């Protein structure tokens, strides 16, 4: 599963000037949501590409160690009494640190880092848990497609040519 870490001072910055305060438990829920979306998006993309998701080490098994860092949710949907609507120009941003290891030898095979920021189109939009999740899914989908493409390239370069 993807681990997650918020951008430095994220909670303090979110709570500055807001009557609705982000609690540690809210942060844990957001991290769990991010991990769930990551698992869902990457599993879908890789299985559609013909890759099997393994729970155990073995021959031809890669260990994938993902970490979402510098997570900056612009407008977290925090439970509150009454009806509260939060607006923001963007869902926020996050960085993926991804490492691939040989599952048997634990040798690092590849490492990648990429930062994604949600689009800014100058319009304020109502931000909800659903819209934040959809935007996270869209951002992570690009990463999943890039991983699948890299794995496809590696597989093609190591597959013996047919005679």
Stretches found by the model and what they are:
Residues 28, 32, 87, 129, ...:
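Flexible, glycine- and charge-enriched loops at secondary-structure boundaries
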Residues 2-7, 67-72, 115:
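Generic short beta-strand segments
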Residues 48-50, 93-95, 104-163:
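C-terminal/domain-edge helix-coil "capping" segments
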Residues 44, 48-107, 118-127:
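Surface-exposed short loop/turn segments
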Residues 14, 71-88, 133-139, 149-153:
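Short, Lys/Arg-enriched charge-dense amphipathic segments
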